Amino acid sequence: SQIIIAYEPVWAISTTIGHKDATPKDSEEMIIFIRKVLADKFGAKAQLPRIIYGGSVNEKDALEFIRDGGAEGLLVGRASLNAKKFIQIIKKCETLNN
């Protein structure tokens, strides 16, 4: 319960040549895969770690990665360098707790 796994597809990193934005569906599929691998190795305890997503999220799509993509949090990169955008991400994600 104290372990957090960050998933960031290399092809979704904005500085990567051939960069391609990931979708919440991409995230969901990989999070399911990660959970299956963990379950094979560790059994029922595999459901305990939180899995967060970190592939070029922004204020427009961050909420979708949590709501539809299976992520339990975000590892915000470039968007965190702009305070207004970062605050927008936080406020949108807070709506899930209401």
Q: What annotation goes with each model-predicted range?
A:
Residues S1-A46:
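Active-site rim beta-loop-alpha module in soluble metabolic enzymes
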Residues I3-P9, Q47-G55, E72-V76:
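Hydrophobic faces of well-ordered beta-strands that scaffold small-molecule active sites
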Residues T16-I17, S56, G70-I89:
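Glycine-rich phosphate-binding active-site loops on the catalytic face of alpha/beta enzymes
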Residues P24-S27, S80-N98:
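C-terminal helical cap(s) of enzyme catalytic domains, especially alpha/beta-barrels
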Residues E28-R35, A62, I87-I90:
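Generic structural signal for well-ordered alpha-helices
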Residues V37-K41, E64, K92:
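A generic secondary-structure signal
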Residues I66-D68:
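Acidic (Asp/Glu)-rich catalytic clusters
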